[in-house]
Design a protein with these regions (language model features):
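Hydrophobic alpha-helical transmembrane segments
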Residues: 2-76, 122-257
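Acidic (Asp/Glu-rich) catalytic motifs at the cytosolic membrane interface
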Residues: 75-121, 147-151, 217-221
Length: 257
C-alpha cells in the first residue's frame, strides 16, 4: 500500500513531502531497485503486514533480552525486516500503479503507531529501559506524530524527517545502540550508574518535545497568517529620497512576499 499523501483522491488533501534524511537518496535508489524485482505474488499489503509483524517480533525479543542479551542481535534483524516492509510497500504500489492514497496513508501510519507502542513496551518489560522513561518517550513520539498529521491535513506539509534524521536513520541508530548495550548496558553519569537506554531515552524525549513545540508554534503562526488572525511581519521601510545633481532619485521599498 502507498504511504504517499501527495496524491489527491476523492478530496484527499495534497501535501508536500519533506524528506531530507542522511540516507534518503541511497534508500530511494535501493527501493527503486527492489520494486521491479519483487515477486508478483507479493503485494503492498503483504509488505505492510510484514513490517508490523517484524515490530511485534522486536518487542518480544526486547522483552526477553534482559535475561538473554544476545537476542539484541535478532532485534537488529527485525529492524531490517521492518524497514523493508515499511519502506517498500508504497514504492511497490506506485511502481505497479495500484496506489490507494487515503487507505495507504491511514493504515501505514496507524501501523507505525502500534509498532512504536510494541517496541517501547518490550523495552519497558526487558529491564533495559525504565518503564517511566519508555512511557515518556512514547508520549513525546506520539505528540510529534500528532503535529505532523495535523500539519499534513491543515497546511499540506508532510514532514517525514527532522533535520538529518528520519525513520531509517532512527532504525540505524537503534541498531547501533543495541550493539552497545549488548556489551555495556549501564554507564556512569554524575557518579551514578544509569541504564544506557534511560540516558539516551531521556535525551531523545527532550529532543522530540522541543521539535513538537517548535513545529507547533510554526504551524500555528502559518495558519494564523493564512486566515488573517495574526499580522504579518512589517515590510521594510522605504529608503529616503536621494537628491542627485541634475535630477531627483527616489527609492522604493521592495516586497519579497
Amino acid at each position: 500500500m502507498t504511504t504517499d499523501p501527495t496524491a489527491q483522491s476523492n478530496g484527499f488533501r495534497e501535501a508536500q513531502r519533506h524528506l531530507a534524511g542522511l540516507t534518503a537518496r541511497a534508500e530511494k535508489r535501493a527501493l527503486l531497485w527492489l520494486a521491479p524485482r519483487t515477486p508478483g505474488w507479493i503485494t503492498s499489503d503483504h509488505l505492510t503486514l510484514l513490517g508490523l509483524v517484524a515490530m511485534a517480533a522486536c518487542a518480544v525479543l526486547y522483552a526477553l533480552a534482559g535475561r538473554l542479551p544476545w537476542l539484541l542481535l535478532l532485534v537488529n534483524l527485525g529492524l531490517a525486516v521492518n524497514w523493508l516492509g515499511d519502506s517498500l510497500d508504497g514504492t511497490l504500489a506506485r511502481y505497479r500503479h495500484v496506489e490507494r492514497p487515503r487507505f495507504g496513508f491511514y493504515v501505514d501510519h496507524l501501523v507505525d503507531a502500534f509498532g512504536a507502542l510494541l517496541v517501547l513496551g518490550g523495552l519497558a518489560l526487558s529491564g533495559l529501559m525504565s518503564p517511566l522513561v519508555a512511557a515518556t518517550f512514547l508520549a513525546a513520539y506520539f505528540l510529534l506524530a500528532i503535529e505532523t498529521y495535523l500539519a499534513t491535513y491543515t497546511i499540506g506539509r508532510f514532514k517525514i524527517s527532522w533535520g538529518p534524521f528520519g525513520g531509517t536513520e532512527l532504525r540505524i541508530g537503534l541498531a547501533l545502540l543495541n550493539g552497545l548495550v549488548l556489551f555495556q548496558p549501564r554507564v556512569a553519569v554524575g557518579g551514578s550508574s544509569w541504564l544506557v537506554f534511560d540516558v539516551l531515552g531521556v535525551g531523545a524525549t527532550a529532543a522530540l518535545g522541543v521539535l513538537a513545540l517548535v513545529a507547533g508554534i510554526r504551524g500555528t503562526r502559518a495558519l494564523a497568517l493564512a486566515e488573517g488572525w495574526a499580522p504579518p511581519l512589517p515590510p521594510p521601510a522605504a529608503p529616503r529620497a536621494a537628491t542627485l545633481s541634475g535630477g531627483r532619485c527616489e527609492g522604493e521599498a521592495l516586497s519579497l512576499v
